[in-house]
From Swiss-Prot:
Active-site residues, as the UniProt record annotates them: D815
Cell compartment(s), UniProt: Nucleus; Chromosome, Centromere, Kinetochore
Subunit relationships: Interacts with CLK1 C-terminus. Associates with the U5 snRNP and NCOR1 deacetylase complexes. Identified in the spliceosome C complex.
Name of the gene: PRP4K
Protein name, entry field: Serine/threonine-protein kinase PRP4 homolog
Covalent link Glycyl lysine isopeptide (Lys-Gly) (interchain with G-Cter in SUMO1), residues: K117
Keywords annotated in UniProt: Acetylation, ATP-binding, Centromere, Chromosome, Isopeptide bond, Kinase, Kinetochore, mRNA processing, mRNA splicing, Nucleotide-binding, Nucleus, Phosphoprotein, Serine/threonine-protein kinase, Spliceosome, Transferase, Ubl conjugation
Crosslinked residue numbers (Glycyl lysine isopeptide (Lys-Gly) (interchain with G-Cter in SUMO2)): K99, K111, K117, K170, K177, K593, K659
GO terms of molecular function: ATP binding; protein serine kinase activity; protein serine/threonine kinase activity
Length: 1007
């Protein structure tokens, strides 16, 4: 680096002379564009030679792909250029050769642009293109002026930014480089497509955009680090005309004054046709013909934009410093995955989107997307902010200057402006970020402000294309391409730059609500620099917006949860776009809350209503049949066996174990390592035990009050005191912490762990208190009948949310069953508990006895590798049991379990059987099922070989049973049957995914 700097410093005097000559020549119009470009690029390459070497390994894979792609394109199109430039290229490094390729491409595009410009000039003469292309070209014009202004500011010496801000700049430069590369890649694709369609006007826009973005990125490279800043300022000074240099030197000498500002503004308008840097000069000279047609319009507009961007820069740099969220890495990671499409907020319903399609289309076309892009990039650099005093003065001066022009221009401009305003209001509504920073300056269209959000990019083709029909067709295919090409890089970038403000702060996945009408008056005061009659219009729009927000607030609560027409979902629209996972989760969570509100005291009533639906005779018949089938859970298979007599005795301290074995280690631990609970004792000097819940394989559970937390009720799980159980307890502790950290807002229905401690060598885990598990609920309320369909629907929503969180954390629960699902007092909210069997998805040891038998998936039984699908299978079995009160597959052995599963779904696919480690226990060499049963007469085992197994169990008949269901409930039962069919697929690859389950009609549609 040092060597490069000294070398370039040595060359500077020579370059300055050359450049001054060049700029004098430029004023006389003597230097060709080619020469200026060559000089510019050669100088730049020399300067940044070492930086590219350091960067090499940072983004190698992405950039290599881009370079290959570019070279392929260029060599195809410009072979004749290469012949001409061969003599130059032979002695050059490959990096310089790519530069010359760029120049060759630019020349070629130059010719095309001249043709297009001629066509457009003809159209302009006839007055056809007032709103469309003309305004876009004007947008580019003012954009290049903005760049000139940036140079001037850099030269005037605004170096007040600290070192931290310079590092921030570095990060952003890296990002900007990547985005410009990606953009040029996808644009080159689009350009070839446009050429084949012979749509020249579009091609023209693309070309201009390509050039300006390229020049932009070149210039941004100059301000890389504080050590290089002086150099870049020299360069800016060189590339300007002598008169401007003289004037700016005078300015530096003087103290800043309001007149200074006036001089600056007037200089801008006078020296529009002077050159500021070779590349800007190109695009400007092209547009000059266009500019001369409506100079007043342009000047007014560009100044308008300039003053606004200044204010926005200063304001945003202030607010950004305050608003940097410190996020936990786990949360960051998850947001990267889930928040793919941030800027489509819940406020933006399909209805609102289509309020004024035509004018919006027009205004979108009439404004340069590049401009917004550039503005948003500038707004992040702290060195370009103005002091508040100067800002106010320049604003008032400009307002005075603009007044007469505005009167003249009101007619052609008002319509696009109005629509911009209305769109701004709409999007202001939609973006929750505004709620947090009312002082922040809004850009013209807040949705487009986040220049690096993938969604904004994917929308840009829609803005460019002309006819609405073509716009729709083009948008779908192009946005798909872009999203694919950018999502990977974007995600990596987002996680890397923690310094920058989080783009998705305030997105609804972080538990925020859609009510932003906080400071709409203040917001609007910032940009009401239009005429007085527009004030009334703004006020009117604001009132309309509030009405719409109110309407949708109620709609979100009342309307059916149908996928296409849900206003509260940001993505769902009539254009067959599937909702994002985040929207689905939001919607389901809202539904669960609503169910909780509505059914606080109705649980028992709904179960009784279900009892009444059963016909009396068949009820008697079923009870007689039921006597034959023993209750599968009377034994200690029950996780929290509240009715387990020896546990009650043990709780009372009457257990006979101690008397029988006087050589026990301690008085408080029994022979099996369980802690002897005494009602009334105090654990860890703060938990006063008042009740005994039950006992599981790993532990027993007591109810206690926390004296340190105002007698808050808790459940304390006391792990058995032996090595294996302690290990299991610590593993459960680790998984619970991971799950709780990933779900700070408690939306995903996994049990909350408060803390843990050791008591007399037993590990104790302190949980939130929950009254009973679903096994007990079924025994108490729904024995042989099951629960109401409304309750089953809500429970299924909550279970799928729990599965979603498990998958996010890469955890398998591996023991989901009604015993391990706890409910609150009102039976409206459930929590998945008991993570003693849980494992990381990668550590899935193949064992045929994982998961309780009735809920064990077929892939576990045959010894095939497994993943999240085993938990989905368990949930399916549990849901059937909740609705019917009966166990779906009450198999006595693994072999019997397979037989019952195949009775429902038909024979297991041979492809799946072959992958099983234990297939020989259940299938013969020809893959026929060997059904092992005990002969009732001889009571000996007999094997029946079954080559084909036809599904004989009718799920729907079992679900409906002997109920006389009303029509709405019958519909829900049919939906439940369909959902269970998809969950209980024998092949885990064909089983429904969690997201698909959350979108199923049974979950989405209310009763």
């Amino acid at each position: 680096m040092a060597a490069a700097e000294t070398q370039s410093l040595r060359e500077q005097p020579e370059m300055e002379d050359a450049n001054s000559e060049k700029s004098i020549n430029e004023e006389n119009g003597e230097v060709s564009e080619d020469q200026s470009q060559n000089k510019h690029s050669r100088h730049k390459k020399k300067k940044h030679k070492h930086r590219s070497k350091h960067k090499k390994h940072k983004h190698s894979s992405e950039e290599d792909k881009d370079k290959k792609h570019k070279h392929k394109h260029k060599h195809k199109k410009h072979k004749r250029k290469e012949v001409i430039d061969a003599s130059d290229k032979e002695g050059m490094s490959p990096a310089k050769r790519t530069k010359l390729d760029d120049l060759a491409l630019l020349e070629d595009l130059e010719k095309q642009r001249a043709l297009i410009k001629a066509e457009l000039d003809n159209e302009l003469m006839e007055g056809k293109v007032q709103s469309g292309m003309g305004l876009i070209l004007q947008g580019y014009e003012s954009g290049s002026e903005e760049e000139g202004e940036i140079h001037e500011k850099a030269r005037n010496g605004n170096r007040s930014s600290t070192r931290s801000s310079s590092t921030k700049g570095k990060l952003e430069l890296v990002d900007n480089k990547i985005t410009t590369k990606k953009r040029s890649k996808s644009r080159s694709k689009e350009r070839t497509r446009h050429r084949s369609d012979k749509k020249k006007s579009k091609g023209g826009i693309e070309i201009i955009k390509e050039k300006t973005t390229r020049s932009k990125s070149k210039e941004r490279k100059k301000s890389k680090s504080p050590s290089k800043r002086s150099k870049s300022q020299d360069q800016a000074r060189k590339s300007k005309s002598p008169t401007l240099r003289r004037r700016s030197q005078e300015k530096i000498g003087k103290a800043r004054s309001p007149t200074d500002d006036k001089v600056k503004i007037e200089d801008k308008s006078k020296s529009k046709d002077r050159k500021k840097s070779p590349i800007i000069n190109e695009s400007r000279s092209r547009d000059r013909g266009k500019k001369s047609r409506s100079p007043v319009d342009l000047r007014g507009k560009s100044k308008d934009r300039r003053s606004r961007s200044k204010e926005r820069k200063s304001k945003r740099s202030e607010t950004d410093k305050e608003k940097k969220p410190i996020k936990s890495p786990s949360k960051d990671a998850s947001s990267g995955k889930e928040n793919r499409s941030p800027s489509r907020r819940p406020g933006r319903s399909p209805k609102r989107r289509s309020l004024s399609p035509k004018p919006r289309d027009k205004s979108r076309r009439s404004r340069s997307p590049l401009l917004n892009d550039r503005r948003s990039k500038q707004s992040k650099s702290p060195s370009r902010t103005l002091s508040p005093g100067r800002r106010a003065k320049s604003r008032s001066l400009e307002r005075k200057r603009r007044e007469p022009e505005r009167r003249r221009l009101s007619s052609p401009r008002t319509r696009p402006r109005d629509d911009i305003l209305s769109r701004r209001e709409r999007s202001k509504d939609a973006s929750p970020i505004n709620r947090w920073s009312p002082t922040r300056r809004r850009s013209r269209s807040p949705i487009r402000r986040r220049s690096r959000s993938p969604l904004r990019r994917s929308r840009s083709p829609r803005r460019r294309s002309r006819s609405p029909r073509r716009r729709d067709r083009g948008r779908r295919s192009r946005s798909r391409l872009r999203r694919r090409s950018r999502s990977r890089g974007g995600r990596r970038r987002r996680s890397r730059s923690k310094v920058k403000e989080d783009k998705f702060k305030g997105s609804l996945s972080e538990g925020m609500k859609v009510e932003q009408e906080s400071s709409s008056d203040d917001n609007l005061e910032d940009f009401d620099v239009e005429e007085e009659d527009e004030e009334a219009l703004i006020e009117q729009r604001r009132i309309q917006r509030q009405a719409i927000v109110q309407k949708y607030k109620y709609l979100a609560e009342d309307s059916n949860m149908s996928v296409p027409s849900e206003p509260s979902s940001p993505q769902s629209s009539t254009r067959t776009r599937s909702p994002s996972p985040d929207d689905i989760l939001e919607r389901v969570a809202a539904d669960v809350k609503e169910y909780e509100r509505e059914n606080v005291d109705t649980f028992e009533a709904s179960v009784k209503a279900k009892h009444n639906l059963m016909t009396v005779e068949q009820n008697n018949g079923s009870s007689q049949k039921k006597l034959l089938a023993p209750d599968m859970f009377t034994e200690s298979d029950d996780m929290f066996a509240a009715y387990f007599d020896s546990a009650r005795l043990r709780a009372a301290g009457i257990g006979k174990d101690f008397k029988e074995n006087p050589n026990l280690r301690d008085n408080w631990t029994d022979a099996e390592g369980y802690y002897r609970v005494n009602i009334g004792e105090v654990l860890d000097k703060r938990y006063n035990v008042y009740g005994y819940t039950g006992q599981g394989v790993f532990s027993n559970v007591v109810r206690a009050r926390d004296n340190a937390r105002a007698s808050q009720e808790v459940a304390v799980k006391i792990i058995r005191n032996n090595e294996l159980m302690q290990k299991t307890g610590l593993k459960e502790l680790e998984f619970l912490k991971k799950l709780n950290d990933a779900d700070p807002d408690d939306k995903f229905h996994c049990l909350r762990l408060f803390r843990h401690f050791y008591h007399k060598q037993h590990l104790c885990l302190v949980f939130e208190p929950l009254s009973m598990n679903l096994r007990e609920v079924l025994k108490k309320y729904g024995k042989d009948v099951g629960l109401h369909i409304k309750a089953v629907r809500s429970y299924s929503q909550q279970l799928f949310l729990a599965l979603k969180l498990l998958k996010r954390c890469n955890i398998l629960h591996a023991d989901i069953k009604p015993d391990n699902i706890l409910v609150n007092e009102s039976k409206t909210i459930l929590k998945l508990c008991d993570f003693g069997s849980a494992s990381h998805v990668a550590d899935n040891d193949i064992t045929p006895y994982l998961v309780s038998r009735f809920y064990r998936a077929p892939e576990i039984i045959i010894g095939k590798s497994y993943d999240y699908g085993i938990d989905m299978w368990s949930v399916g079995c549990t849901l059937y049991e909740l609705y019917t009160g009966k166990i779906l597959f009450p198999g006595k052995t693994n072999n019997h379990m397979l037989k019952l599963a195949m009775d429902l779904k038909g024979k297991m696919p041979n492809k799946m059987i072959r992958k099983g480690v234990f297939k020989d226990q259940h299938f013969d060499p020809n893959l026929n099922f060997m059904y092992i049963e005990v002969d009732k007469v001889t009571e000996r085992e007999k094997v029946t070989v079954m080559s084909t197994i036809n599904p004989t169990k009718d799920l729907l008949a079992d679900l409906i049973g002997c109920q006389r269901l009303p029509e709405d409930q019958r519909k829900k039962v049919h939906q439940l049957k369909d959902l269970l069919d998809q969950i209980l697929m024998l092949d885990p690859a064909k089983r429904i995914s969690i997201n698909q389950a959350l979108q199923h009609a049974f979950i989405q549609e209310k009763i």
